[in-house]
Design a protein with these regions (language model features):
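Short alpha-helical DNA-recognition segment
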Residues: 16-37
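A short, Lys/Arg-rich alpha-helix, primarily the initiator
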Residues: 1-17, 23
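DNA major-groove recognition helix of helix-turn-helix/homeodomain DNA-binding modules
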Residues: 29, 48-63
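Key DNA-contact positions within bacterial/archaeal DNA-binding proteins
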Residues: 32-36, 43, 62
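Alpha-solenoid HEAT/Armadillo repeat architecture
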Residues: 13, 40-43
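Short, charged recognition helix plus adjacent turn
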Residues: 1-2, 14-15, 37, 55, ...
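Residues that mark the N-terminal boundary/hinge immediately upstream of a DNA-recognition element
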Residues: 7, 19-20, 46-49, 60
Length: 66
């Protein structure tokens, strides 16, 4: 995944208004713990989670995982 954790954090922080990790994860349909681990690079998200994240940010999977 390379720079995925940093990209994910920057996507969340670039949204206006800026939302907390808890609110963002709930809107995505993920648990706050899962999003936290993805942003820290502790766990790589599975395809299901990647699709939820990409849909939330209105970007393609390619853009998300580049």
């Amino acid at each position: 995944m390379g720079e995925f954790p940093e990209r994910l954090r920057k996507l969340r922080e670039s949204m206006r208004p800026v939302r907390s990790m808890t609110v963002t994860s709930q809107l995505m349909g993920l648990s706050p713990d899962a999003l936290r681990k993805y942003e820290r690079g502790e766990v790589e998200p599975k395809m299901t989670a990647l699709k939820l994240i990409a849909a939330y940010y209105h970007i393609s999977l390619d853009e998300l995982c580049k």
